[in-house]
């Protein structure tokens, strides 16, 4: 689809790579759909795999959809230049070998709102054999986190101004929210991606195994959230190194 489209009350099953794909996807309305079993062709590294994958999404609304059993792909991936979008009232369930449920990439301008969703069970996609062994107390003294394990509810890559509000995010293999800057992803005279000014407000985080929230820097905010069945140090600020592992 190329913008100005409505996708409503469809059942999309067993798409090998992508359920709904869009370019220059302005003014999209995607609502009341069931999208399940996407990604069985194991093409996540092809860059275009997702139950919904849109480029340059502007003024879009994605609401009241059910995503189930997406395999090695994102439930939603908004790629580059996304502004004034709302993702609301969706169920994101059982991401199989899934790196993240929602991926917002390379978005420097404008606010995007993710609110009132349930994100549940994001398994992660990584090789367990590569997880460093930390016998005894050796893990206490490391100066940075290893980057092997993933499995995020929401992942922002080089993305600013996310608003994440009133969501239930649970059973994520790594973190409910994770973001990182992409400092050198600059085109022409544009700046790189900084991943600042995210606000996480009034969410419930349940049993995210490494941390509830991993912020790249202090230039982000978490306020009024509830943390259930989390381990110590479940609020993390990763840069500048060494990371700090905090709680309320």
Label the predicted regions.
Residues 1-8, 13-248:
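Glycine- and acidic/polar-rich repeat regions and solenoidal domains
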